[in-house]
Design a protein with these regions (language model features):
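Active-site-adjacent C-terminal substructures of enzyme catalytic domains
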Residues: 180-316
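Active-site gating loops and adjacent loop-to-helix segments of metal-dependent hydrolytic enzymes
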Residues: 2-31, 79, 84-96, 154-185, ...
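C-terminal cap of metal-dependent C-N hydrolases
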Residues: 305-346
Length: 346
């Protein structure tokens, strides 16, 4: 359902588009066809590794994991948890149901995959009660699982979290209280971080939380522009995300371009102290920056795993010979006119 409902903001889009679509995945026939398309698109894309949200349904999540295993890509896939503020047709009816289904899913994935890893996935704080967060934190600690979720994406969402969790000083604390926000050698990635304040940023850095910058999604849903220049300058861990279906494409090349474009708008219109991103910085976020969530990935340096693309840029012919840096920039900006000849994932 990419490319639909792009005239709405986040919360309206979730209720109008996302939740009704996700409910269809309880039908395995529908899920198989939809996930087959997704797996094929991912295999054809420039992506070698990804974190993926499935739905709350155990069987369809396992189906997606099986399909992604066959692509050869390295992925972390999560069964979504949500026990409040969701439609009756999609919500997990109790903390116990959510916990039982999540344990069942983890049991069924144990030792089954070479390329796919389970990742705990509380949808976001508005959809997960404190009791559920507490139980998921215990699961994370017991099984040493990575975590993915959303953080400070939309102004209305941030205000809603404050209403739901008045005890929290900021959004990130609603995860951190239950051990779901990095720290203790835990791998956590939070999408968006558009409105993360200074205290939240300090905790992210202290706990080693990864930021998945999703510029196209943040633009499509009118969420805002994350201060990525500040994150990079402060030494935060930052990678790029497509956030489909909030984003309309899985292309990381387009994510790189979007990241540069929105940083220029933020610099010009909102804060001239935060200089725009450069092409090398955007490329770093799409390779080594995001790859670090998976280990030593995203570079050709000694000791790194061999993830690589062979890209044919001969379609970008020009009378003047180009150096390697210029060729890379053109591939990033004109990726639709290039051809991906091969892809390798360690």
């Amino acid at each position: 359902f990419r490319g639909l409902g792009m005239d709405m903001e986040l919360l309206a889009w979730l209720n109008t588009n996302t939740f009704p679509e996700e409910a269809r995945y309880r039908d395995l026939k529908y899920a198989k066809e939809a996930y087959r398309i997704f797996a094929q698109d991912m295999k054809k894309s420039a992506t070698t590794r990804a974190c993926v949200f499935a739905t709350r349904h155990v069987d369809s999540t396992l189906l997606l994991m099986n399909l992604m295993e066959k692509t050869g890509l390295k992925t972390m896939i999560g069964k979504v948890n949500m026990d409040r503020n969701a439609p009756d047709y999609l919500i997990e009816s109790s903390v116990q149901e959510a916990l039982d289904e999540t344990k069942d899913w983890l049991k069924k994935t144990h030792g089954k995959f070479n390329n796919v890893t389970p990742i705990l996935t509380p949808r976001f704080t508005p959809a997960c009660s404190d009791d559920l967060m507490k139980e998921l934190g215990a699961l994370r600690e017991k099984y040493e699982l990575p975590v993915q979720s959303h953080l400070s994406e939309n102004r209305d969402e941030v205000a809603w979290v404050k209403e739901l969790c008045p005890w929290s000083a900021f959004y990130g604390e609603t995860y951190d209280k239950y051990g779901l926000f990095g720290g203790r050698n835990q791998n956590t990635v939070m999408a968006h971080c558009v409105y993360s304040g200074e205290a939240e940023q300090r905790l992210m850095k202290e706990n080693g939380v990864f930021i998945a910058h999703c510029p196209e999604s943040n633009t499509n849903l009118a969420s805002g522009i994350a201060p990525v220049r500040k994150y990079l300058d402060d030494g935060q861990k930052v990678g790029l995300g497509s956030d489909v279906a909030g984003g309309s494409t899985e292309s990381l090349f387009k994510a790189m371009v979007s990241a540069i474009l929105v940083s220029k708008l933020r610099w010009r219109l909102a804060d001239e102290s935060l200089k725009p991103l450069t092409v090398p910085e955007a490329f770093y976020m799409g390779t080594k920056g995001g790859g670090a969530f998976f280990g030593k990935v995203g570079s050709f340096e000694p000791g790194y795993e061999m993830d690589a693309l062979i890209v044919d840029d001969s379609f970008l012919a020009w009378p003047k010979e180009r150096n390697l840096r210029d060729r890379l920039e053109r591939v990033i900006y004109l990726s639709d006119r290039c051809e991906l000849r091969a892809k390798y994932t360690a």
